Curated annotation (Swiss-Prot):
Region (Disordered): 154-180
Physiological role: ELH acts as a neurotransmitter locally, upon neurons of the abdominal ganglion and as a hormone by diffusing into the circulating hemolymph and modulating the activity of other organs. It specifically causes contraction of smooth muscle in the ovotestis and expulsion of the egg string. Alpha-BCP decreases the activity of a cluster of neurons in the left upper quadrant of the abdominal ganglion.
Main location: secreted
Residues that make up the propeptide removed upon maturation: 30-85, 102-140, 154-195
Subcellular location: Secreted
Signal peptide limits: 1-29
Name assigned to this protein: ELH type 1
Positions of modified residues (Lysine amide): K233
Gene name of the encoded protein: ELH1
Keyword Signal part of the UniProt annotation: yes
């Protein structure tokens, strides 16, 4: 067997490198009708589905949705989460801003993406497109505001919408005059409040005076009962003392008679 050809191995490796580089270069660009249209990165960040002059739809990858719903996007770190949310909102605002620009781009007809694909994530808190028509709120705890179109306002349906909408029912033009009280009603309510306060104070004072009188009567009654009990106790003690003295005299007389008999 002969020696292996190192030159042929080097040529094969060089050929493989060239093939890989060509494949990488071809993957970075998307060819539309034989002309280099846009890179893959531009397609990812583009807000439009671009149509050719013959109105043939050009396929576009759902890279935005993949970025929005990727598991690495919902990271445990709060800082990364906030950064990713800001980045995604920046892309959505870019879509809205491009929609307002004049649609004249070198003969190509830019068309906005469908509502389903433009909305990044239906379950996301930062979704710009919702079924109820509410726009993105910077403070999630704040109530969502509903905006009515200019056509309805011009047609005079603003009052009807305010009446049907419970959020703006208290601020409607018809009920605004009824909600604002007049000076006379304010004065009458103030006078009635003052009169009620005075009557309450008088009732409290009468109750306090009645309690004081009752306490005084109870105290006088208690002192009279105590005095009577002391008097009764003194009488009993004096009678006991008198009875004891009488018994002593009788005992003395008995002792004297016994002594006389013994003699």
């Amino acid at each position: 067997m002969g020696r292996p050809s190192y030159r042929s191995a080097a040529a094969i490796s060089l050929l493989m490198c060239l093939i890989l580089s060509a494949l990488c270069a071809s993957s970075e660009s998307a060819v539309v009708h034989g002309s280099s249209f846009a890179t893959e990165r531009a397609v990812k960040s583009s807000p439009y589905l671009v149509l050719s002059p013959a109105d043939e739809m050009v396929g576009m990858s759902t890279a935005n949705e993949a970025f929005d719903k990727s598991p690495s996007y919902y990271d445990d770190d709060d800082d990364d989460f906030v950064k990713n949310e800001k980045r995604r909102l920046r892309f959505h605002k870019r879509r809205i801003r491009f929609n307002k620009r004049p649609q004249e781009v070198s003969g190509l007809k830019p068309v906005m993406m469908s509502r389903a694909s433009a909305s990044a994530d239906e379950n996301s808190l930062f979704d710009l497109y919702n079924t109820d028509g509410a726009m993105y709120q910077r403070d999630l705890r704040a109530p969502r505001l509903r905006f009515y179109s200019l056509r309805k306002r011009a047609a005079g349906d603003e009052d009807k919408s305010e009446e049907n909408n419970p959020e703006t029912e208290s601020h409607s033009r018809r009920k605004r005059s009824a909600l604002t009280p007049s000076i006379r009603s304010l004065r009458s309510s103030l006078e009635s409040g003052i009169a009620k306060r005075i009557s309450i104070n008088q009732d409290l004072k009468a109750i306090a005076d009645m309690l004081i009188v009752e306490q005084k009567q109870e105290r006088e009654k208690y002192l009279a009962d105590l005095r009577q009990r002391l008097l009764n106790k003194g009488k009993r003690s004096s009678e006991v003392a008198l009875a004891a003295s009488d018994k002593g005299d009788e005992e003395r007389e008995l002792l004297n008679t016994l002594s006389n008999l013994l003699e």
